[in-house]
Amino acid sequence: MMIPSGECTYAGRKRRKPIQKRRLTMGAEKSNPSKRHRDRLNTELDHLASLLPFSPDIISKLDKLSVLRLSVSYLRVKSFFQALQETCVWSAPALSPEEHSYRGFPVQEGRLLLESLNGFALVVSAEGMIFYASATIVDYLGFHQTDVMHQNIYDYIHVDDRQDFCRQLHWAMDPPQVVFGQSPHADTDNTVLGKLLRAQEGGKGLPSEYSAFLTRCFICRVRCLLDSTSGFLTMQFQGKLKFLFGQKKKTPSGTALPPRLSLFCIVAPVLPSVTEMKMKSTFLKAKHRADIVVTMDSRAKAVTSLCESELHPKLNYLAGKSNGENGISLFRGQTDRSHWARALARSSCLCLRGGPDLLDPKGTSGDREEEDQKHILRRSPGAWGQREMHKYSYGLETPVHLRHLNWSTEQRSQESTTKLTRQPSKNEPSTCLVPHGSCVPYPGSQGMLSASNMASFRDSLDHPTGAYCSQMNRPLSDIHQGQVDPSTCHISQGSLGSRIPLTGMQRFTARGFSTEDAKLPSLPVTIGTPCNPVLSLDVPIKMENESGSQDIVEASTTSCLWLGTSDMARGHLVGFPARMHLKTEPDYRQQACTPHLGHGMLGTNPYSRDTVGSCREHAPLYSAHCTCLDPEPPHHLFMCSHSESQHPSLDQDCRAPIVKREPLDSPSWAAPGQVTVPRMFPKSASKTVIPSKGSDGIFLP
């Protein structure tokens, strides 16, 4: 039986046996031979129907043709199993008949196996006849088992999928064209099928070289009575082609035909969506697309920073690829040996002007550092979560070229202040000078820098530099470091380092982008330029008890350090007892940085004057991205100092201004001449070491 021609018709609900009306006999009637024949035929059909393996309520609904069709189908199935037992060698059952019973009742293993399937069993002959369909077909298609047995399979397949289903029934997926009067078997088919049949009859099984040709897995649309929308349900057919023994078919001339390959498969529905599923198990089936395009939620796209155009031609693993914004960053830079060096971020670098530069002196990644890092990772449960989040950034694909920046001063007449302006000049690489007696920075320490040139660190300074790590971003082991050419060393203005990095010092640009593109607000250090942009660790701090409000007002008006934030807070100045106010009383020096390193970083201020007892205002030191303890970064710095102008010698050490630490607890600090709110620092600010007496200097970034 092949694909039906003519108009496309699909199988529907079968016609049931009509209810016969019985007339009451009124006495003796004349006998009718035709009626007696029909009665004998109906009696035989009823007896035949009673022999079918169905329940009485199902049998009572069957018409005469259905009883004959099901009887033929039952006999064919029985003949198949009898022939299978004769040709195949069956091993002895592992369990005895007594063990197949539960509490004296036999266990129907076949029914339990069918119920466990996420689908139904189906056997289709080579002619397209449904040889067998399990009773569970009614749960998926709405057809009862008695409706489909020994029926044409193409009546249930969508018209667009019938040719594909016909190809699946052939061993080479190339069925021959059936011509009237000729055998459907070609010479090639007879040769291959004969070889397969002899191998299986001999008990050897199917040859391995033909196993790939006999495996089937395809999808077709099948007629479904349970679907009220389209009437079809997409089903997956998965199984193999096997010989259907015991059919004993013959040609028109009477020659017996060999067994034909038939499709033995499990038919499972391909469910369209999760909300429409009616499933017995947790296994799902889906039809994959060829491009393997991943679909993402809008929230997932926001996290991964990917759009539809980026996801369309990509594979699934690219959708969740890291963009380097979260987790642990990997810095990558080119060394002087023309190879790339990678290193993990040691800590978060808190700089005065927000420059994302990180300086790591050579030799800090020693054995003791690795031991300290492992010890920190063992005692910190949160560090293991960061260890699993390795994210790599490949922003530095080219060597970093630094751009030399010139700084000039610009006087503002209205506010009587001096403003720094940055002017670009020629792209000349800056060189680093190794000074004598400079302080070695602690890049692992978590510190705070203020405009008053005070650096406070939470960690003690008793351990070597390699033992320090930031509490915000703990370092991990296995750091591959490389060295950068010292001729291109670059230090950010107000960074944690208090001097120029040594020769062989490592420099990595944070977040994986180049320095030139990021436009870092920092200064290239040239030869002869002092590189103490911040106050060194030796800052003298003077502690005094609280005094009267008059003393506070007088002290704040004569010699105070005011860090401006905004003019809105002038009338709302409130003291906080938990915070301390830091102010400086420096002796003015013409140069603002370490004198033994050369000329001043900012140069001599042409607008500066030496006055006695007057307030001198210097350049604004803070940028909009300053990292300090206060919520808002300051914009300007106004410094008042006494008159004493001496140019220190080049051999003197850099000294810090004397910082007085006083409590701020009264709103009477707001003097008429005050323009901004003083900076607040908590009492828990770390103390620093007091150096020996000497000439003082003012440190400007």
UniProtKB/Swiss-Prot annotation:
Any one GO MF annotation of this record:
protein dimerization activity
CDD domains listed in its UniProt record: bHLH-PAS_AhRR (cd11435), PAS (cd00130)
**Up-regulation conditions:** By 3MC. Up-regulated by 2,3,7,8-tetrachlorodibenzo-p-dioxin (TCDD) and beta-naphthoflavone in pituitary.
Which keywords, in A-to-Z order, does the entry hold?
Cytoplasm, DNA-binding, Isopeptide bond, Nucleus, Transcription, Transcription regulation, Ubl conjugation
Q: Where are the transmembrane segments?
A: none
Q: Does the keyword GTP-binding apply?
A: no
Asked whether the UniProt record includes Cytoplasm among its keywords, one would answer: yes
Cross-link Glycyl lysine isopeptide (Lys-Gly) (interchain with G-Cter in SUMO2), sequence positions: 583, 660
Question: Which residue stretches does the UniProt record annotate as biased composition, category Polar residues?
Answer: 409-430
The protein's superkingdom reads Eukaryota
A Gene Ontology CC term for this entry?
A: nucleus
Question: Where in the numbering of this chain does the PAS domain appear?
Answer: 106-176
Where's the bHLH domain? Answer: 25-78
Cellular location(s): Cytoplasm; Nucleus
Please provide the Gene Ontology terms (biological process) for this protein.
negative regulation of DNA-templated transcription; negative regulation of transcription by RNA polymerase II; positive regulation of protein sumoylation; response to xenobiotic stimulus; xenobiotic metabolic process
Region annotation (Needed for transcriptional repression) maps to 555-701
Which intervals of the chain are annotated as region Disordered?
Answer: 409-432
Report the function annotation for this chain. Mediates dioxin toxicity and is involved in regulation of cell growth and differentiation. Represses the transcription activity of AHR by competing with this transcription factor for heterodimer formation with the ARNT and subsequently binding to the xenobiotic response element (XRE) sequence present in the promoter regulatory region of variety of genes. Represses CYP1A1 by binding the XRE sequence and recruiting ANKRA2, HDAC4 and/or HDAC5. Autoregulates its expression by associating with its own XRE site.
Q: What PANTHER family would the database entry show? A: ARYL HYDROCARBON RECEPTOR, ARYL HYDROCARBON RECEPTOR REPRESSOR
Relate the assembly described in the record. Answer: Interacts with ARNT, ANKRA2, HDAC4 and HDAC5. Interacts with ARNT; forms a heterodimer with ARNT.
> Mind telling me what this protein is named?
Aryl hydrocarbon receptor repressor
